[in-house]
């Protein structure tokens, strides 16, 4: 029996996936600037022609990798709110998610390189800014949902809380990137969990004490 012949669209999709995989590996191992188009196509088993028939440049490919990473993060966050449970349980899961992401976000170095590149490339800056803005809107919407469902008043606007929380997470990730030994430091987890807990539970502390970070980890591991 002859193997099924792939359509042009399917072959193109397969080529893009292999280029994505090779680029992601190379960028994380060598860094974006030190990785050439030749490195990527050699790793994927293609030619430069295959690369440029799918992407305009390395920056274009990097932006697409960041888009995928952002989409995965949003899907993970949505899944938290699809689980059954009280608003307090959803809040605990959200806190645990960010504590976990701080330790396990493998693609964070790509975001750091993208932010630096965006300072010198206005077109690329627009793409990276759009991705981060979308992330902030997504987190803000979930914070608003949590506080609405639990009948708690927001201490700040949801978008301000999202900006503060995401910025704190990115700052802690940057410290972990520069000092890898600190990535597993329990203090880092406590800082993230307690900050989020003090904000998201602020209005209901008298009714229900904020969940401690160890309890958040229990929820995370379920």
Question: Where do the protein language model's features map onto the residues?
Answer:
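Hydrophobic/aromatic-rich alpha-helical bundle segments in the mid-to-C-terminal region
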Residues: 124-126, 147-222
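Hydrophobic alpha-helical connector segments
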Residues: 64, 78-108, 154, 158-165, ...
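Amphipathic alpha-helical packing segments from all-alpha helical-bundle domains
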Residues: 79, 104-112, 122-148, 160, ...
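Helix-turn-helix
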Residues: 18, 22-60, 64
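Solvent-exposed, amphipathic alpha-helical segments
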Residues: 18, 22-29, 76-80, 110, ...
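Generic hydrophobic, amphipathic alpha-helix propensity
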Residues: 12-23, 40, 65-69, 73, ...
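Short loop-to-helix capping motifs
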Residues: 57, 120-122
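Secondary-structure edge/capping motif, primarily at the C-terminal ends of alpha-helices
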Residues: 84, 115-119, 176-180
